[in-house]
Structure formats: C-alpha cells, structure tokens
Amino acid sequence: PIAGSMVLAAILLKLGGYGIIRMMQIMPTTKTDMFLPFIVLALWGAILANLTCLQQTDLKSLIAYSSVSHMGLVVAAIMIQTPWGLSGAMTLMIAHGFTSSALFCLANTTYERTHTRILILTRGFHNILPMATTWWLLTNLMNIAIPPTMNFTSELLIMSALFSWCPTTIILLGLSMLITASYSLHMFLSTQMGPTLLNNQTEPTHSREHLLMTLHITPLMMISMKPELIM
C-alpha cells in the first residue's frame, strides 16, 4: 500500500533519528572521537545505499534506498554533537520527509496507470501526463538538494559540520551527493523521457493527485524561504 510507504518514509524513519538525538543528550559532549567508527559507518552506508539506488530497476525500491542513504547523513551529523550538525540533521529529516513521501506518491501515480514499477516500462510520461512530469522534476530537484530548497540548506549545514570536525569526510560526503544527483536524474529520465511503451489509453491525472503533491511541495517551499522556523 502506498499510504504505508509514505508514512514509513516520512514519519517512522525519522523516529530513529529523533531517538538518536535524545540518546546523544546523555552522552559526554567532549568525547566525539569515540563516535568515529559510527560516523564513518554512517557515511559509508550512505554511499553504499546510493550505489544500490543506481542499480535498482524497481521504482519503489529506488526511493526506499534513497531514504536509507539520507538517514546515513543524519546519523553522521548527530554523532558530531555540534549545533550545526544537529540543525542540519533536524532540517534534513523534515525536508526529506516531504520529499520521499512525494516521490512515493508519484510512484503510485505511475503504477496506477502502467501497473508496473519497472523503470524501463514507465518511460515517455512527459507526452501523456505533462503536469505529473512537472511534479517529478520538482521533487527530484529537491531530492538532489539544489538551492534554495531546504534540502540544500540541511546538506550545507551537515557538510560544514563534518568538514570542521574532520576535513577528510568531505570526500565521502561529496561522493554521496554526486551519486544522489546521478540516480535522481536517472530516475527522472527513465520514467518521463523517451518513447512511451503504453498501447492502451491512459487516464489523466486527477485533482486529488495534484492537491496531494501541492500539499507536499508547498510547505517545503515555504519553510525553505524561512528556515529559522525549524532550526
């Protein structure tokens, strides 16, 4: 069920990050070096999840692994125990909650019309559903974290916190962001561009689907213009 995937990615996955934040409050703040293995594992796990996204052919699996990779950045930022790292982790959890939920919603919109989640079988939707393609583009750009979205603000805070803690981490973080941009563009091009493989008539997008996407994108845009509300 798509509703379960949306709630899982947007809310339940973030409860783990919230639990880590609460647990870190009772840890000694001066002993950041003891968390070095966890930070390295979190960043390496984010890269591996991103690489797994690149070889996925199932649309929902790709989005799910994308959520895993972003949570790796969140864990690494929380472990540093700095104000910038904590703000970046909180902001990324909220931003990615909206983004991943919107991606699952769009995946369901595609599935209802093609009855498949295989990327290569869902191509050519920009000719059939141009408004849905617009939503796909906006959501993928937010997943890539381009400015001035809140995703960009959060990743910039996390990058600054990690770099000030250990400059070497910029290599792992930069590689993770590069792969994120690669699979996000691959997902958009695979589902929207190219010749369509559908022979039957496809129903247009409904008002409820546009309303659902608006309720995902609009709050994210508004918080992006005033990020101090959550930081």
Swiss-Prot record:
EC nos: 7.1.1.2
Compartment(s) of residence: Mitochondrion membrane
BP terms from Gene Ontology: ATP synthesis coupled electron transport; electron transport coupled proton transport
Residue ranges of the TM segments: 1-21, 34-54, 63-85, 89-111, 128-148, 156-176
Family matches, as InterPro entries: NADH_UbQ_OxRdtase, ND/Mrp_TM
Presence of the UniProt keyword Transmembrane helix in the record: yes
Record keywords, A-Z: Electron transport, Membrane, Mitochondrion, NAD, Respiratory chain, Translocase, Transmembrane, Transmembrane helix, Transport, Ubiquinone
Known catalytic reactions: a ubiquinone + NADH + 5 H(+)(in) = a ubiquinol + NAD(+) + 4 H(+)(out)
GO molecular function: NADH dehydrogenase (ubiquinone) activity; ubiquinone binding
A GO cellular component entry from the record: mitochondrial membrane
Membrane-protein topology: Multi-pass membrane protein
Top-level EC class: translocase
Annotated PANTHER family: NADH-UBIQUINONE OXIDOREDUCTASE CHAIN 4
Physiological role: Core subunit of the mitochondrial membrane respiratory chain NADH dehydrogenase (Complex I) that is believed to belong to the minimal assembly required for catalysis. Complex I functions in the transfer of electrons from NADH to the respiratory chain. The immediate electron acceptor for the enzyme is believed to be ubiquinone.
UniProt family annotation: Belongs to the complex I subunit 4 family.
Listed name of the protein: NADH-ubiquinone oxidoreductase chain 4
Gene: MT-ND4
